[in-house]
Amino acid sequence: VYPQAAVDPLDGSNSWLHKAPTAHNDVNFIEAIIDTLSNNYNIDNDRVYACGYSEGGIFSYELGCRLNNRIAAFSAISGSMLVDAFRVSYYNLGNCSPIHPTAVLLIPGSADSNPHSTYSGFQPYYMSVNEITTYWANHNNTDTNPIVTPISNTNNSDGSTVEMRIWKNGDNCVAVKELKVINGDHDWPGSFGNMDINATQEIWKFLSKYDINGLINCGLTSSIEINESEIQIFPNPTSQHLSINGINEKNLNYTIYNSKGELVINGVLNSNKFSVDISELESHIYILRIGNFSYKIIKE
């Protein structure tokens, strides 16, 4: 769902938050959208996510702060988080006040020079990335120190690389994850800027593991370990068979759901090179779930 921002009366631009003071309440607008979708479609209200780019990233933080009872997890790309003092003094919004452990994914660029998304922050208005991750790591009670992993530099011509930083073991198994684009600008990786990662795919892979209660199946013990980086799902789109490679554990359940959340196919992966016949499905978008991971597939 892509909400349309209202026109700012001062400069004619589309903005999620009109210049103060204003009678507009964008958070109430988003809540009304969620209510409307819930009343008309079979959505899972425990798995409502938010994501945004630039000012949309700032707004995603606001939803995480002010509509936390409806937002399971969220992601922000090239957008910062308002400093509480600025939020209170200028916008009269009150402090950020999340009420449940909330998984957060940030994808910032270290060379982003926009005032509202610079990596080092823009005091006293916008927090730095380090301040943001510290805030959510503290709120979620995660490990103090992140696990830092370099991402393969698969594209040498984009002028940037990616470093993954993840704070694990939060309450209800939630995590805070940063995909730092080193030398990255005000970009959406995978579409423009860095090409080592695809921001759209990274967002869904991360958020879809959580619901309003935290990590789905948190606390369940299992001997099965899935290395998501080794999973290959192709061709996608497809009209006949979908190949699933890289699952090294046998007898792992998989499920496919339609856009209404209805189960349409399920089975067991009994080989590390498995094929699923989806030829009988209607041409549409579906969700494949393997363990805690979800993937969008397109039936032609």
Where are these regions (language model features)?
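The feature captures the conserved acid-bearing segment of alpha/beta-hydrolase catalytic domains
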Residues: 72-73, 78-148, 153-160, 167-171
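Alpha/beta-hydrolase-fold serine-hydrolase catalytic core, especially in secreted/extracellular enzymes
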Residues: 102, 137-224, 262
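Short glycine-enriched nucleophile-adjacent loop
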Residues: 57-68, 78
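Serine-hydrolase catalytic machinery in alpha/beta-hydrolase-like enzymes
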Residues: 1-49, 53, 62, 66, ...
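Solvent-exposed loop/turn segments at secondary-structure junctions
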Residues: 6-10, 54-58, 79-83, 110-114, ...
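C-terminal outer-membrane/trafficking sorting elements
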Residues: 225-300
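Extracellular/periplasmic catalytic domains that process cell-envelope and extracellular macromolecules
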Residues: 42-44, 51, 55, 66-69, ...
